Every structure is written in structure tokens, then in C-alpha cells.
Amino acid sequence: CKLGDDGSDVAVRLGDRIIRYRLNVPGRHWVQNSLAVLGTVSALGGDPDRAAAALADLTAPKGRGARVNVQTPAGLLTVIDDSYNASPASMRAAFAVLGNTRPQSGGRRIAVLGDMLELGAKSAQQHAALAGDLEANRIDQVFCAGPDMAALDNVLPTAMRGGKATDSKSLAPQVCNAVTAGDVVLVKGSLGSRMALIVDALRALETNDGLE
């Protein structure tokens, strides 16, 4: 498997055959999902070659890793909209995707993160534990929305702290004022964190309607 910033080239052995196919969505987790699909198709007696070919048409849906190019007055930036849901595992998978995405010249890798909800008594610890993964994936700046994400902000290196707020609506202006041409911006959080508001604010920069 060869992972790229815009997708993956996969070769899998099924019995005595090797099937090669292209996924046009980036991330190891998408590769793992595709392997499960091919295994299921094969087990049910279907045609894994046809299934592999169909996987080339797969696109990440809105809120689940869809990429949006935003042409701002300053230049182009890329938004990775992963705002629909979040867990510790899916956060780490998203960081890996961001880490494998090369910003344009002068750009940065930016993570804008909202609370992961329903984690119980150890929620703060699980949020703080994401710091090492952010550093390992060479994320340049991190913005945090929500009381649980404040625990992450508290343990980040000073140079990585982009800003924090109590909720996504309050954080949106900070993010919009910070992004520059060439940046790749991941927006992720549980649905209840309403991180889609920040995606919308970033998209509005294209028409100069961003938040003041």
C-alpha cells in the first residue's frame, strides 16, 4: 500500500491472486475499510475485481473527510471537513491524514479541534493524550474549542497553540484571522461540538463573508 496526500494505491492478495486498485480518499483507515469490503465480497461469492474497480469512485462525504479548496483574497487554502464525529481513534487517523498532506509553499498544517463527547470520567485525559500524535504528525498549529479540548491546549508546546475558546462559534474568528494561503486546515470534533460552523466560516472567506 502506498499512501499519498490525495489517495492510496493498494495491492492485496486474495487467495492466489493479487488485486491492485486506487482509492481517491487519503488515509490508512480508508484502506482498511476497503480491505474489509473486498474480503466480504469475496466471502459472499462476488467479484472482487469489480468491487475494487468500484472503490475508485469512492469520495469522502461532507463532514467525513471531504476536502474543500477555498480561494481567499490572499490565495488558496485547503479545508479537510471531518466535522461530523470524533473519537480518540478517529482523531488519530485524521491527524495521520493531515500529516501526510503537503501544504503549498509557505503553508502550514493546522488542526482545529472540538470536544470528543461522551468519553466519561477520563475525558480530559483522553483529550490531553492527543498531543503526542499531533507532534508526531508534524502539525504546526492547533486550535481548540470546548472545555475538554482545553485539556489538550494546556499540554501543547507553546509554539503549537493557535488559540482556544469555549465553543466553535467563539473560535471561528480566531481561525479565520489566522489562516493564510497554502495552509491545510483539518476541522474535526463530535457533532455536538458544532465544528461545521468553522468549516462554513472558512468557506465564507472565499467571498469575503468570513466572520469579523
Question: Where on the chain are the PLM-derived regions?
Answer:
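Residue-level recognition of beta-strand microenvironments
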Residues: 1-3
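ATP-dependent carboxylate-amine ligase
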Residues: 5-6, 16-20, 24-29, 35-212
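A general beta-strand register signal
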Residues: 11-13
